[in-house]
Amino acid sequence: MPGKLLVQGWRFIHHSYALVAQAHCLSLRRYADIALRFEDLPFPTTAWQQSRGIFLASDEEAIAALPPPETGFVPDVTLQFKGDFSPPPAGRKFTFDTPEVRALTPEARRGFASGAEVPESVHVLTPSRWTAQGYLRFGIPAERVHVVPHGVDPRLLRPQEERRLRVRRELGLADAFVIMSVGAMTGNKGIDLLLRAFARIAEGAPDARLVLKGADDLYASREFLRATLDALPAAERTLVTPRLAYIGERFSARQMAGFLHAADLYVAPYLAEGFNLPVLEAAACGVPVICTGGGSTDDFTDPSFAWRIRSQPIQMRTQWGGVGDGLLPDLDHLTELLRSALAQREQIRAMGAAGAAWIAQRFTWDAVTDRLVRELFADARAGGELGPRPSPG
């Protein structure tokens, strides 16, 4: 019997949950024996507006053409890209969420005092071992907590030297050493640490530039960055500001890939992350990485291309007034790693090439979607009933 899969999520919105849902759906089309349907979830705020141009045009046509569930469609599995423990009408349900501080929001708990109360038909899908701990602590049985990482599109996210040089020229950074970070500029991203570390290395590296990419359409990224700069000591702010470039507009997948290619070094000194997809994407482009050690990125980085910042566990206040887990990266160690990268420019380019090969072998969307299918349809896979279409030729 073919597997029937209902995916519930968002389309054509520049949010990580939407990007992941759509990327998986594109890859799921390879499976001739999965009947795939897509149901749009309402947006959490009227400020969100759909827009095209995020994915490649051919991919967006395929996403738009995903059929909704017809009358009488009874899924074997429902994959919902929203934290919700309510049971499905039929079959099994996998609820996707990324509790970045390893504590579940009141909305996700939605009346359940512990995981022991969550119906057995409800499973959890989450992208890292770090976030999985949040569900295990809540009491969800380990056999119903499934870790499937995110992936990259190798058509776009791979080393491309000609493109790298062109984008650097367009950005006016042809001769600079470009240190880059991408994210919402929220408190968990560690942008204050990055600014302070950059101030420390700025005088000794006159060609270093710090390039930050925010998301002004979904978050107050520019305002947060401005407040963070204002909070710096005046001497540090004077060193950083002339060397800092900020870009907040929405990018398509192709534009984002080009932007990442322009970097010499990608830095993510985060305090708490559910996954941190830009780290994976930068590495896929051949950019060496510095990121917080001990967190979600440990799952998909390797010492051959990523330097991990020493960190210590901390407690973090949540937006809903609770307490969760975080990591405090060591500022001195981050500064030391930045100086090492600046002093070893050819060596870190070789690290970047190693990282691109490592990611391409393990973390394409097709590869991680195959892992997803094994989790969603474990019973059917055991019987050998499911499999992707054979490649043409």
Language-model features: where?
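Acidic anion/phosphate-binding donor-loop and adjacent secondary structure
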Residues: 136, 152-170
